[in-house]
Amino acid sequence: VLTKLEVGQRCSEITRSQEIDSGGTALRADLFLAVDVPLPWPKPVFNHQLLMGVEELLSNHSFPLRLVASVPENNNALTLTAYTLNDDSLNRQQWVFNPPDLSSLLERVLEGQTIEGFEEVPQEEQKRELWICTQGSHDVCCGSEGTSLALEASTKFSEVEIRRVSHLGGHRFAPTAITFPERRMWSHLNMEDLQTIFGVSSIDDKLTRKCRGWCGSKTGAEQVAEREGLKIYGRDWDRYVRKSEIISEENSEIRVQVDGIHPESRSQVGFEAVLQEVEKTPVLSCDKAGSIPNKWQTQYEIKKVNVHS
């Protein structure tokens, strides 16, 4: 495994060529917020004039959340989109805001208050959405590969809302994205992958390996274990109300219990995944080329899966 990125090398190309597994690197969040922020975006994006004070506002809340900037469709009608988890179901809401009022709107959303004084955008049922990281100021791979995929996807998937968003973590896995309402993150995506994800055909093992994780499970072993559900139950697995939990850790062996309840039949399923920590790979970054990485990612291998009948 390459331990240092040379100047001129791209982190996503190296990670792809070395077949580094992105499993376990997804965000852990129950609330996702996308704020329309006009380009260009600085690094970090919170230094943008529109987002001044927002990072401090978010730090006052301890529940898992992620706020990203989103390229506006209309700079004169900026929106805030929120995906909130209520009783295991994901709700999408959207409001139009004036820049001086953003903090006030965010505060109400974060506190779970009734939103008054802001125009709410009517929502379509079961909207499919893709947030692709395209922040070139954070990493050249997301800026180039992410933007290219987002623009092509926008012309091919009319029924899916494609958003170009700021840093989602894992730029070494560009193009990287998150799908809604599934809350599943993906790595090294291409158009063929998106056709499968937004289509009806089964998700094969090759595409499952591109899954960074489901954002309802903790980062690391739990996310690697949870994605095995895609192999066992197929794409219907994303409809189950799921929970995962590490039940034992001994030496480098980890046991994870994953349970799911079908939303309609209420039938319960579950499995135990036995994982092995096999190695640690460097977190490569284009903007740190030439220097030794200071972050490392644990690679896991699934040893066996025991499905409960």
Tell me what each language-model feature is:
Residues 1-309:
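Histidine/cysteine-enriched polar flanking segments
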